[in-house]
Amino acid sequence: MEFRTALDAIFAHDLAQDAVRISASNTRGSQRDEAKTAFSPQSLLDGDYDTYWTTDDSVCSAEIALVFAESQTFNRILLQEYIPLGQRVERFRVDVFDENGLRRTIARGTTIGYKRIVLTEPCTTDNLYIVIEKARACPVLNKLALYMDTITQTTP
């Protein structure tokens, strides 16, 4: 399989789009209505580079939760910061609820930058959490995506 064809196949279906709910522990302007604020976590799924989720200025750690009606299996997590406002995230982790209903960490990382694709073992869950543990300023993310790579043999 050619490289371009393989990439197109791996990133063809964003499983995060199948989420029935996305929420955040803090959203700028959420005291009004999280769903209506310009900085809603929904911005992570809208495909528009210039829309983004962010927290209030004083909040430098936060959690984003994706909930699915049915369990999803993935092994690639794409995170993207809105770089026009600067690279801010210094440390993050990805948590899921496992088959026993226990929350566990499946990946950890430092900076995200323009785009970070986190490689994991195949994971099946109906609840996924992106936990921003530390940031230089309020985190500003504009994309969250999940993929299942069945082509390459690369694992973490």
Which residue ranges define each predicted feature?
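Disordered, acidic Ser/Thr/Pro-rich linker "stalks" and the adjacent N-terminal cap
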Residues: 1-70, 74, 82-88, 147-156
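Trp- and acidic/polar-enriched beta-sheet ligand-binding modules for extracellular glycan
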Residues: 57-62, 72, 83-152, 156
